[in-house]
Amino acid sequence: MALWVTAVLALACLGGLAAPGPVPRSVSLPLTLKELIEELSNITQDQTPLCNGSMVWSVDLAAGGFCVALDSLTNISNCNAIYRTQRILHGLCNRKAPTTVSSLPDTKIEVAHFITKLLSYTKQLFRHGPF
């Protein structure tokens, strides 16, 4: 009988380990912005060339926010330094479906310069944001 109870308890414990996965934690906007600021600061402090000097479209962050920043960085490939930034931006972009851009950007800038602009925008939003 004791062996039977032990087996049932063991199966119950193993069943809990095989559960679908952890419940995603809800992260507030200020914490996510702070995480993005830390990531962008780390990227800008590194003195090595960022993404082999790749170029991205210069966008108006004040008008489009994090979604246009994500769109601009999406076409960069083989650049491990910005993967975490892209993931954070994806979480901050609250757009449900792709939208059409009314005016196409016509200027490209280096990724390093874009990251610096994004850092300034994020810091300003963190200080004066509506949360």
UniProtKB/Swiss-Prot annotation:
Signal sequence region: 1-18
Q: Which residues are glycosylated?
A: N42, N52, N75
Record text on subunit structure and interactions: Interacts with IL13RA2.
- Subcellular location(s) of the protein: Secreted
Please indicate which superkingdom the organism of origin belongs to: Eukaryota
Q: Name one GO molecular function term.
A: cytokine receptor binding
Disulfide bond found in the keyword field: yes
The function of this protein is: Cytokine that plays important roles in allergic inflammation and immune response to parasite infection. Synergizes with IL2 in regulating interferon-gamma synthesis. Stimulates B-cell proliferation, and activation of eosinophils, basophils, and mast cells. Plays an important role in controlling IL33 activity by modulating the production of transmembrane and soluble forms of interleukin-1 receptor-like 1/IL1RL1.
Record-given protein name: Interleukin-13
Report, from the record, the phenotype seen after gene disruption: Deletion mice have increased eosinophilic inflammation and splenomegaly. In addition, mice show exacerbated effects of IL33 administration, including increased immune cell infiltration in the peritoneum with expanded eosinophil and ILC2 populations, and reduced circulating and peritoneal sST2.
Give me the disulphide-bonded residues. Answer: C51-C79, C67-C93
Q: Which family does it belong to?
A: Belongs to the IL-4/IL-13 family.
**Gene3D superfamilies membership:** 1.20.1250.10
* One Gene Ontology CC term in the entry: external side of plasma membrane
Q: Which UniProt keywords apply?
A: Cytokine, Disulfide bond, Glycoprotein, Secreted, Signal
Q: Name one GO biological process term.
A: positive regulation of transcription by RNA polymerase II
Coiled-coil ranges per UniProt: none
